[in-house]
């Protein structure tokens, strides 16, 4: 057995902290979204720690062509409902993204915190922005992804499964969206 292990060499499969290995169909997804749930790819969200129900809905929307993003539609085409659920459950068990090393620029954080509080983002996304049920985690998400999503909702390009985000973002100016994304991507308790 030892000889076989030496011949095969070290494993290149990431350890999943005692969790089961990812479903086979999820492998291409992890290449961009991160094997540990934390994306290192520009414009691609981190999925670790997202609520399973939220992930399931998004995967369903991609599969059905109700939300478009290359290559997600092609990757999920033909997935069964059970495969969507397995993928969502696996991703939800991965650790949430780590906050960036820098604590953030107070000149950007303070006004964004007030704007986010005034618009009650924490009501749906929770006070710690960890998300719940069908509402995504925003805390420590990639800033570039958050900004793209916020702009998409505000402009109506990204519709989601209801109009809540488009309505909530209407009073927020386009020029304020970058600071909102910055704040959420640098979120820490007590900030």
Predicted feature locations:
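Sequence/structural segment immediately N-terminal to covalent heme-attachment motifs in c-type
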Residues: 16-38, 99-127, 142
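Gly/Gly-Pro-rich "capping" loops immediately C-terminal to redox-active cysteine motifs
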Residues: 22, 37-68, 73-79, 117, ...
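Generic helix-packing signal
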Residues: 26, 41, 92, 116, ...
